[in-house]
């Protein structure tokens, strides 16, 4: 089962629907109602396959227990942050999260990506839809994270941890005008399974 941490966002059920189309089980929990012990229990019972941290209207400093979820579980289970979820991951690992030059709401921009991880087997450039006013500065992340995607003017659009199954995108993969949204979701599900399989073999 996958957990969707809902940051009180109007897009969350669009994102959920993309995941459910891949024939997975998913539970949705609001960011201030989630119980860390419940997540730990799911992990111990082998029931938790991954965590998705949804978009949301606020900031990483006002997101319920999301910061604690990332801190406590990023070494144990795959986590995928979307929009606010991306900013939360950056914030937890010491990045500056600040206002961009101007808000971008519903705008389509081209990104350049690594062709790896979330972007495996996808074109190196394609269009995504952005809804955000905050951006993550990459400078403090370079030791521990791969820069997976940026806009043409250098705004950070996606991250992955170098050592753990931690991934994030600033844009909305579930938006209609985002290209390859379903493929990115599938890639995350594959990455989550690879991590589970690798760690199961160790025990």
Protein language model features and the residues they cover:
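Extreme N-terminal starter segment of soluble prokaryotic enzymes
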Residues: 1-3
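Acyltransferase
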Residues: 176-203
